[in-house]
Amino acid sequence: VPGRERSSDQLGAAAAVHGALQTGSLTTTFKASQGLLLMIPSMFKIAGELTPAVFHISARTLATHALSIFGDHSDVMSARSTGFGMLASGSVQEAQDMALIAHAATLAARIPFMHYFDGFRTSHEENKIEVLQPADMRAMIDDQLVFAHRMRAMSPDRPVLRGTAQNPDVFFTAREACNPFYEACPAIVPQTMDKFAAVV
């Protein structure tokens, strides 16, 4: 059953997303500029653990010498080094379509994604679009991939060790072990887009 939780602050939301993902939940969040920056430590963990997730970002200017609520990509680019894949939308229709593509691709690739769009114009725009139907969404999500995600969840029935402190040799080996997932991702995203074109 889908649920929605609201955190008292952005930092708590980041930790809640990470925790929910560790339990095998299909979890997403919606963020903009300053809130995204508060999530960066958790984003490194999520990407490092190869956990499927999608963060929908209304991209806005970061506050520097002054606050600005208008759109640019400075917030998204600040989070670029976290290991998240990045998909951009240029219209309301694309925002809907890319959102579904991102959710399907993250399950296949095990790479989390930032799906971002203009945080002032696109996020406030009202427009007629071709709305995705529940059957279309269902067809895009592979049940086997959802099951695999849930089997990687933390459970007393399947104990695993996570969040350890490691010496440089072991840490380096573990970091290199995730490279095949990143190397496969550029092929998975176009395949997911092709599937979307066939389904919708």
Which residues make up each language-model segment?
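Conformationally flexible catalytic loops at phosphate/diphosphate-handling active centers
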Residues: 113-200
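Thiamine diphosphate
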Residues: 1-78, 84-107
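Flexible glycine/proline-enriched surface loops and loop-helix/loop-strand junctions
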Residues: 82-83, 177
